[in-house]
Swiss-Prot record:
Residues 298-324 are annotated as: Disordered. One of its GO terms (cellular component) is cytosol. It is found in: Cytoplasm; Nucleus. This is Cyclin-G2. The keyword Ribosomal protein does not apply. GO terms for biological process: cell division; regulation of cell cycle. It comes from Mus musculus. Highest levels in intestine. Intermediate levels in spleen, brain and kidney. Low levels in testis, stomach, pancreas, liver, salivary gland and muscle. According to PubMed:9139721 also abundant in thymus. May play a role in growth regulation and in negative regulation of cell cycle progression. It comes from the Eukaryota.
Length: 344
């Protein structure tokens, strides 16, 4: 704290923020995935019957799709990734069990980060994720994950540091908060979370790199000076800082590329049987025959009610043409998926 100087710690709010920063710094190593396990995962060949980094990254993108679908917050996603990585780095997991583990990590994180009424039911998550396991399987796997992580699931993550750095920076400047979008920073953090290499970075360093790159983009000298003082407070070496900043910069450059499949835009994919596909074709894409609506005429009560019901059923179908009957892989956006899976 002394390194920052009295000028930058003026006021009680600044002291409280740096006190919280010190607490986070003490906690972060405790919730860091085992580096040896992460390195082993990266070195595993893709054709082997063991978990590799590509499968892990794909599962994290699935977690992002689930958080989008159920309207969960960034905290749920980041916490689910932390639980997943800590478990995978600790245990020898077969690829066939990864779907069940991913669902469990999402549910465990949602119960910690979301309001009680916003936590999706287990059966709904199973149905949407198509993980091919039962509610009993999920319950057993949740118990295994919790026990292996010693029930320490509420981790200090890079998102905690990102929010805290953002608050510290604007506590000591007259700049408007709008110039440094927290939503944009969170989206960039999600992109980094989709790559296993960033699970080896300390959360405090990853968050600092993201904020540093964004401040350099908006070219604010004042904000950059404050952030460098925060870096000094962390006792972070230039070697470590510039190493991770370069990796983050490359990741964000690729993430901004039109060829990149961004997790925010990734659609849920359902593989269904041919019979189910035919039922979906006929039920969702069919255009019902609607009765003619007379101009200026009068309806009796029953006719009016029936007509209104028919129109609501066919309203969304009019602009869509049915795909080929041979196709059994469906790409739904979240609104359509909710209509099919959770009918009113």
């Amino acid at each position: 704290m002394k390194d920052l100087g009295a000028k930058h710690l003026a006021g009680g709010e600044g002291v409280q923020l740096f006190g919280l920063l010190n607490f986070y710094l003490e906690q972060e190593q405790r919730y860091q995935p085992r580096e040896k396990g992460l390195i082993l995962m990266e070195a595993t060949p893709e054709n082997d019957n063991t978990l590799c980094s590509r499968l892990r990254n794909a599962k994290v993108e699935d977690l992002r799709s689930l958080t989008n679908f159920f309207g969960s917050g960034t905290e749920t996603f980041v916490l689910a990734v932390n639980i997943l990585d800590r478990f995978l780095a600790l245990m020898k997991v077969k690829p066939k069990h990864l779907s069940c583990i991913g669902v469990c990590c999402f549910l465990l994180a949602a119960r910690l980060a979301e309001e009680e009424g916003d936590v999706p039911p287990t059966h709904d998550v199973i149905r949407i994720s198509q993980c091919k396991c039962t509610a009993s399987d999920i319950k057993r796997m949740e118990k295994i994950i919790s026990e292996k992580l010693h029930y320490e699931l509420e981790a200090t993550t890079a998102l905690n540091f990102l929010h805290l750095y953002h608050a510290i920076v604007f506590c000591h400047t007259s700049e408007r908060k709008e110039i440094l979008s927290l939503d944009k920073l969170e989206a960039q953090l999600k992109a980094c979370n989709c790559r296993v290499v960033f699970s080896k970075a300390r959360p405090s360093v990853l968050a600092l790199c993201l904020l540093n790159l964004e401040i350099e983009t908006i070219k604010s000298v004042e904000l950059l000076e404050i952030l460098l003082l925060v870096k000094k407070h962390l006792k972070l070496s230039d070697t470590e800082f510039f190493y991770w900043r370069e990796l983050v910069s490359k990741c964000l450059a690729e993430y901004s590329s039109p060829r990149c499949c961004k997790p925010d835009l990734k659609k849920l994919v359902w593989i269904v049987s041919r019979r189910t596909a035919q039922n979906l074709h006929s039920s969702y894409y069919s255009v019902p025959e609607l009765p003619t609506i007379p101009e200026g005429g009068c309806f009796d009560g029953s006719e009016s009610e029936d007509s209104g019901e028919d129109m609501s059923c066919g309203e969304e179908s009019l602009s869509s043409s049915p795909p080929s009957d041979q196709e059994c892989t469906f790409f739904f956006d979240f609104q359509v998926a909710q209509t099919l899976c959770f009918p009113p």
